[in-house]
Amino acid sequence: MKNIRNFSIIAHIDHGKSTLSDRFIQVCNGLSEREMKEQVLDSMDIERERGITIKAQSVTLDYTARDGQTYQLNFIDTPGHVDFSYEVSRSLAACEGALLVVDAAQGVEAQTVANCYTAIEQNLEVIPILNKIDLPSAEPDRVAQEIEKIIGIDATGATTCSAKIGIGVEDVLETIVAKVPAPEGDVNAKLQALIIDSWFDNYLGVVSLVRVKNGTIKKGEKFKVMSTGVAYQVDRLGVFTPKMKDLDHLKAGEVGFIVAGIKDIHGAPVGDTLTHAHNPTDKPVPGFKKVQPQVYAGMFTISSDDYPDFREALEKLSLNDASLFFEPEVSQALGFGFRCGFLGMLHMEIIQERLEREYNLDLITSAPTVVYKAIKKDGEIIEVDNLSKLPEPGAIAEIQEPIVRANILVPKDYVGSVITICIEKRGVQVDLNYVGNQVSITYDLPMIEVVSDFFDTLKSVTKGYGSLDYELIRYEPANMVCLDVLINGDKVDALASIVHKDQAKYKGRELVERLKELIPRQMFEVAIQAAIGGTIVARSTVKALRKNVLAKCYGGDVSRKKKLLEKQKEGKKRMKNIGSVEIPQEAFLSVLKK
């Protein structure tokens, strides 16, 4: 056991984490030259296209160090984006050490700081590594100082490397062997194994990635899942090198996969503990905090025939992504679908993209909202993640909205523009610190403002250098109202939203004008209105198409023409009363995308 090293890499998007892991695999001959491709561990197409890591992956490599001993390195890859911080905390729970990889040209970013604190809280040994030192703009000394000032860990003599051209990779591996502590645990004790991740394979059933804390698990043995008490038999177990490599057993300190023919998707929940069926342990391994969805949206299939496939796809995805929440929902405008909870907007986009690609579904998503608290006059508190749960306006004493503490790191040239967008988003400044070239700005912001398009705006005003990390801190009363959209007097539930009263008129006008362009002209007039309760705050009209009924009259008497026009008017009136407006799918999509 003393030769096992479990570690993960903490790094911001684009700081070279996936490339460094490719080099580890090459140096340790994990894959043959023919099988190597860039970003081996980013197995999803979306991960490669967007250049981000979404799912945690694991690799076991054998490395012969300079002291002549062979070490087993269990490396767990982690995502860098703020929406996937839960994946990070899961990966860290299985490690004794973490490499903090920082781009020597760009410096420390906000998410790296947040993930680094998670690692320190879990008592991991954090080792700073400066990557990309081959770049002409690299300033390793400045960045090392930044690491010390912002994060507070000693970065003097930090290992430097360039994963792209392969310099210093062996030094990094030597540093891991020297500094990451060996795992603790007893091979002969009762079995305790923590499930770090599970996913559904169409041939094997549920595949679980586990970290064995104590004891040994062998092929053919029976184990049980502690939260459900159900027992299964091990069909296959082994490690990823990144390919699946079968072994006879996994012992304390190791990280590997277990396949037990579990067909029920919820059979092996992430964060659970496995133990022997015949000689179980009393206490589970302390898992990690259950994560609460922050953003909710309705998802509907464009054709109602896909509904059963949609449900199955969500169930399979939720096994692999423990932070996805869903429940059935019906909308008058969009039909049957699910109300889904996500960690943030990127998470929502990725889930929608995965559903559309991997399961061939055509989906439409309603406007995202966060969880508000409505306090009724009789003191009852209702959590509102869906507008249909909002009580009547007369019964509400106050609405409270979630406030997040946002920590923004930007180069000092952009401070002014960042403060401006924070003020526009109703933010309150908490702190501002200059650290070398970077400025750390802390703001309390309403969560709805952060999840809608704050990240994109921040990136554009800071030319891509700004980074953001946020956490929910409290709820506070806010002047929120429900903005309804009426088309010919009928409410369209899919377009309703909760907005701040000060912005209601502006948002209403914007929405109405946008719909006016998107709804095709009908044979009768279509009135589009935005309303708060009974008050109309904006209105627009799609003019009617009309046939020229006087075309056949040529000359003739004026009273004859009048009669025809009156008749047309009557017909239009009747049509307006009984005609319904077809709103094209594009209109919904365009309005909801904003």
Curated annotation (Swiss-Prot):
Q: Which superkingdom heads the taxonomic lineage of this protein's source? A: Bacteria
Tell me which Gene Ontology terms the entry assigns under biological process.
positive regulation of translation
One GO cellular component, as annotated: plasma membrane
* Catalyzed reactions per annotation: GTP + H2O = GDP + phosphate + H(+)
Location(s), subcellular: Cell inner membrane
Q: Which HAMAP family match?
A: LepA
- Give the protein's biological function: Required for accurate and efficient protein synthesis under certain stress conditions. May act as a fidelity factor of the translation reaction, by catalyzing a one-codon backward translocation of tRNAs on improperly translocated ribosomes. Back-translocation proceeds from a post-translocation (POST) complex to a pre-translocation (PRE) complex, thus giving elongation factor G a second chance to translocate the tRNAs correctly. Binds to ribosomes in a GTP-dependent manner.
What is this protein's name? Answer: Elongation factor 4
Q: Which gene encodes it?
A: lepA
